[in-house]
Amino acid sequence: MPQRGPTSVYLDEFRVGFNPRPDPLERALKAAQMSVDLDPTGHLSQHALAQVHFYRGDLEAFFPAAQKGVQLNPNDSTIVAMTGLLTAYAGEWESGLGMLEKAMALDPYHPGWYYFPLAFEHYRNGNYERALEEARKVNMPGYYPTHMTLAAIYGQLGRTKEALVSIENLLQLFPGYGTRAWEELEKWFTKPDMVEHVVEGLRKAGLEIPEDRRDDVAGPRSGVG
């Protein structure tokens, strides 16, 4: 039986802190590789393996695995979109956003998380008003990155009132996020300058974030991945 299910469970231990146990990424890697071995032409198995490589920071393995997953089923809009998101966050913004554009064309009624990379593309280039336009399209109030993204943008724009509301919403979903900000952002953005840029926006928004990258203990929080 393909091991995509266990792979997702193990990844969520790492991504969102559900039932955390030791070495979630190593367990995810073994399960994902077994899934690919059992189902070598399955795009979901290949995509699961690509995700594991991404979160392990092995971009050399991530890119070919991600490309293969899309090639095996180029019409699965969710897989194309998630691959685009991870590709963009891995630093290949043009390629990643191209995949997001294709995914949106495949599914005109796509979920709001498709807009995160578009918002951060404008954010990283200092186009904060455009970033805000895209971030507002996410419309996922129960997902903590929605409020984290808005807070960073509002912070950069100097819109104090909206920034504080976003911080309050963020902390309701993820108490203590400030002490975990470095760690959480580094799970997604592979480039240190991007992580620092987002931290800068969050600090301007009023969130207290330590100078060092502390690995404090936190429980599960509300969200997806």
Question: What annotation goes with each model-predicted range?
Answer:
Residues R4, V9-D12:
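Carboxylate/His-rich catalytic cores and anion/metal-binding grooves
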Residues L11-D12, P22, A28-V36, G42-F54, ...:
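Alpha-helical protein-protein interaction modules
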